[in-house]
Swiss-Prot record:
Belongs to the complex I subunit 3 family. Core subunit of the mitochondrial membrane respiratory chain NADH dehydrogenase (Complex I) that is believed to belong to the minimal assembly required for catalysis. Complex I functions in the transfer of electrons from NADH to the respiratory chain. The immediate electron acceptor for the enzyme is believed to be ubiquinone. Its main location: mitochondrion. InterPro entries: NAD(P)H_OxRDtase_bac/plastid (IPR023043), NADH_UbQ/plastoQ_OxRdtase_su3 (IPR000440), NDAH_ubi_oxred_su3_sf (IPR038430). HAMAP family: NDH1_NuoA. This is NADH-ubiquinone oxidoreductase chain 3. The keyword Mitochondrion applies. It catalyses: a ubiquinone + NADH + 5 H(+)(in) = a ubiquinol + NAD(+) + 4 H(+)(out). Pfam families: Oxidored_q4. It comes from Marchantia polymorpha (Common liverwort).
Length: 118
């Protein structure tokens, strides 16, 4: 019984999502697919220079993955900083160990050349 509000929330979310998808299909015009210009790529009013589905350099993916990893790790700092006076020395030193491991990972990636753009 304690999970009833979560179940109600999920049911309402599902119903609202289905209603919105249904309304969009109901009011969508099928004539918009008839114009090939609507399906073409748009680059600031110019004709596209190249195919829009070209390959990206792997470095873009590497930098984005590194950003996501370090960004998620930094999100652990906010709750720690807010509750620093309540967690005591154990919480402080455990976060220092966490930051030390984070720093070691950053230095390792730097030394391996993951952050070089050459």
């Amino acid at each position: 019984m304690e999970f009833a509000p979560i179940f109600v929330y999920l049911v309402i979310s599902l119903l609202l999502s289905l209603i919105l998808i249904g309304v969009s299909f109901l009011f969508a015009s099928s004539s918009s697919l008839a114009y090939p210009e609507k399906l073409s790529a748009y680059e600031c009013g110019f004709d596209p220079f190249d195919d829009a589905r070209s390959r990206f350099d792997i470095r873009f993916y590497l930098v984005s993955i590194l950003f996501i990893i370090f960004d998620l790790e930094v999100t652990f700092l906010f709750p720690w900083a807010v509750s620093l006076n309540k967690i005591g020395l154990f919480g402080f030193w455990s976060m220092m160990v966490f930051l030390f491991i984070l720093t070691i990972g950053f230095v390792y990636e730097w030394k391996k050349g993951a952050l070089d753009w050459e």
